Amino acid sequence: IFDNGDSSMSLGYLQTDKSSLIEKNALALSFINKKLDTSFLIGHSNEKNGFLNNSFEGALSVEKNNPTNFIAFKKNKKTKMGELMFVSSLGTTDVKNNNNSLIRNIDDVFTSSFAINYSKPNILFNNSNLNFSILQPQRVESGSMTYDIPGLNDKDGSLNYTTYTSDLDPSGRQVDLSIKYSIANKTGIKYIIENKLTNDHGHVSRDNLDYQIAASMMFDF
């Protein structure tokens, strides 16, 4: 839309392939201030036959169009000690109900996510990078679903239903702590080792932490 050197504003559109489990299209307006190294993103996305990357079909189907409005913020800060980055997003989703579904209503769906990342180049060796990050994947902070559960038939053959309402916010909050070290050589090969500690994987409350260690190699050509 405009770019005056220090600041810019752009409008983007994204559409997933129709072969995807959930068809999604999104429209986003972004503003970037290069001096402050700060950016804002405001957008609107629409998912077909589902919401928040979850598919709802058959007896638990929802309508074709389920819009989400979201806002995101990103801030970078470069210092002599390295670079610090913070990213956060908030969203609200309006789920459209299907009259032929056992789901009656899905209301007040509010989501959040955030990430904090610190990186320091040239630790121990040239062309190396040490990275610390804390991440919370997208989580439903609030929302409720009202639905019918079929019971026994009456003598006349009519089916009885019992209506329930359940909160959609999960029992836990997934937070990932990651430490990653990478080094590249002159031939274009990059060696990476990453340690990750996860609390409440999948936003399901757990007594224990999950630990992962991974080593990989990348070659640029």
Where are these regions (language model features)?
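Outer membrane beta-barrel transmembrane domains
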Residues: 1, 7-12, 19, 25-30, ...
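Outer-membrane beta-barrel "beta-signal"
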Residues: 208-221
